[in-house]
Structure formats: structure tokens, C-alpha cells
Regions:
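C-terminal long alpha-helix characteristic of the crotonase
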Residues: 1-5, 86-91, 142-190, 203, ...
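A structural preference for short, pocket-lining loop segments at secondary-structure junctions
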Residues: 1-37, 55-65, 84, 88-92, ...
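Short, active-site-adjacent cap segments at secondary-structure transitions
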Residues: 22-26, 71-73, 177
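A short acidic, glycine-rich active-site loop
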Residues: 36-47
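CoA-thioester-processing core
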Residues: 52-58, 66, 72-126, 139, ...
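Well-ordered beta-strand positions
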Residues: 84, 123, 127-129, 135, ...
């Protein structure tokens, strides 16, 4: 519900997600609950989790995951739903679901391979291993690794840098990238043209271009 409200709030330019305290970014799924449900009930549970991650992924504002601790299972899937991931040097990430008898169910099998590639995704999912922040950065799972003490400051700094740009330009870029990710090149280029055109109908584009031209003439 919060993200649905944010999606309609034009005053919010960037969203930062982080966990409370220093221990975990997100605890992920409720394993005790999962141990008691039927196969049919598990489908609904997985669909609910996928709806949550899809809602985060599709919100119009750019999203930054400030991964402050453990991001395992559903927590890692939530982080992967964000556009940018900044991890504390103490963070640990992974998809350990196979250790309890199931594959990732909240989008992990699909988003992980799109972020780090199929081979590395298979390794992480099949082994269920937990990796440190530095390795996560090395394979492209997170964008940056920073000291825990400066995590929020660094996330805010990036958010401010994004927010200083054209809101429409950034949001249309997000649409083009997200929709083009699974398309062939020609379709993706068509999506880019649509995003480009949409920005040309917005007054902010004219104001920014005029200001740039006037500044260049001085």
C-alpha cells in the first residue's frame, strides 16, 4: 500500500529502502508459516511475495536499496527489485531457499540471472551460499560497497544526485530500461523513442534545455 501511495506522489523523487538497525535489511519470508501450509496455499504465498517485489520494481520513482545487513531469500529478492543497491561492508546476500527444500519464490530465480548472469545465478541458487558485500559488488549484484557508518549518507547522496535531474527524464529512462530489458533491440529502441517523445511534451524539458542554451551563450 505504501508504494502504491508513493507511485501517485509527485513530491517524492527518489525512494530509499533500508532495514531497521544494523542486523538485517529484510528478514525475508516467514519460514515457520511456510512449514505449515499446503501446496495450494504456498502458491498464494509466493504470488503475494511476487506482488510485493513487482510493486517495488514498478514504482515510478527510482529506488535505492541501502543494504545494511543480511539480505537473504526474500530480503535479497526485495533488494533486487530496487533500481540501485548500495551495501554496507557488513552486508551479506544470498538465496538460500534450497536449503529448506524450495527454490526462490519471490522472483529470485528470474531477477538474479538478469542482474548477475545465468551461470553465477545458478551457482548462488544451487549452493544456497551467502556472499559478502565485496563479492556481491564484484559480480554486479550491488552497485557500491561502503562502510556501514556511512551507508545512509551515501544512499542519500545518490538520491539527491538523481533528484536534481529532470523527474520526467529519470522516470521515462526507468520505464525504457525496465520494459526494454526483456525485449529485442528493435523493440527496445522503439520504447526509447516513446520515452524520448513523452519528455518532449513536458514543460520541464523545455525549461531545462532553454536554461542550458542560455548558460552556454554567456
Amino acid at each position: 500500500k505504501t508504494f502504491e501511495e508513493l507511485n501517485h506522489n509527485d513530491d517524492v523523487k527518489v525512494i530509499i529502502l533500508t532495514g531497521e538497525g544494523e542486523k538485517a535489511f529484510s528478514a525475508g519470508a516467514d519460514i515457520e508459516y511456510m512449514s505449515k501450509i499446503s501446496a495450494d496455499e504456498s502458491v498464494e504465498y509466493a504470488k503475494t511475495g511476487q506482488l510485493v517485489t513487482a510493486t517495488v520494481e514498478l514504482v515510478k520513482q527510482p529506488t535505492i536499496a541501502a543494504v545494511n545487513g543480511f539480505a537473504l531469500g526474500g530480503g535479497c529478492e526485495l533488494a533486487m527489485s530496487c533500481d540501485i543497491r548500495i551495501a554496507a561492508d557488513t552486508a551479506r546476500l544470498g538465496q538460500p531457499e534450497v536449503t529448506i527444500g524450495v527454490p526462490p519464490g519471490w522472483g529470485g530465480t528470474q531477477r538474479l540471472m538478469r542482474i548477475v548472469g545465468i551461470a553465477k545465478a545458478k551457482e548462488l541458487v544451487y549452493t544456497g551460499k551467502m556472499i559478502k558485500a565485496d563479492e556481491a559488488k564484484e559480480i554486479g549484484l550491488v552497485n557500491h560497497v561502503v562502510p556501514l557508518a556511512s551507508l545512509h549518507e551515501e544512499a542519500l547522496k545518490m538520491a539527491q544526485q538523481i533528484a536534481a535531474n529532470s523527474t520526467m527524464g529519470v522516470q521515462m529512462s526507468k520505464v525504457a530500461i525496465n520494459k526494454g530489458r526483456n525485449a529485442d533491440l528493435d523493440t527496445g529502441l522503439g520504447l526509447e523513442i516513446l520515452a524520448w517523445r513523452n519528455c518532449f511534451t513536458h514543460p520541464d524539458r523545455q525549461e531545462r534545455m532553454t536554461a542550458f542554451v542560455n548558460k552556454s551563450k554567456k
